[in-house]
Amino acid sequence: MVHIIPKTQRDIMLLIRSHVIMQKSFILHLTFLWSLYTLMTIQGTFIYIPVFAGANVKENICDLHCRWQCGTRLMVKYTFHHRHRWPESKAPMNTFKEQISTIMHLVTDC
């Protein structure tokens, strides 16, 4: 397990891209200064990346989906959620378990 603190969205993207290209088997936790939390888990040839965002994350990366295909069957998908934009009763996710089960849905085969 590795802990790092990237400072920008670009840092996150470069980090994820480099790990995808290397195709390492790992579980990676990223904890950000602005309360962004990421869990990456490789299962088979796919990487699943649920991502949390705190109130300080910029609006323009809310609900951002990024994908890369590496080789023939490796895909990355991750999502930023802006929790404070929804009323409490309509928040997209309320627990860590719900966050993982709701956000991480691999929509297609590479």
Curated annotation (Swiss-Prot):
Protein name: Probable protein L3
Assigned keywords, A-Z: Late protein
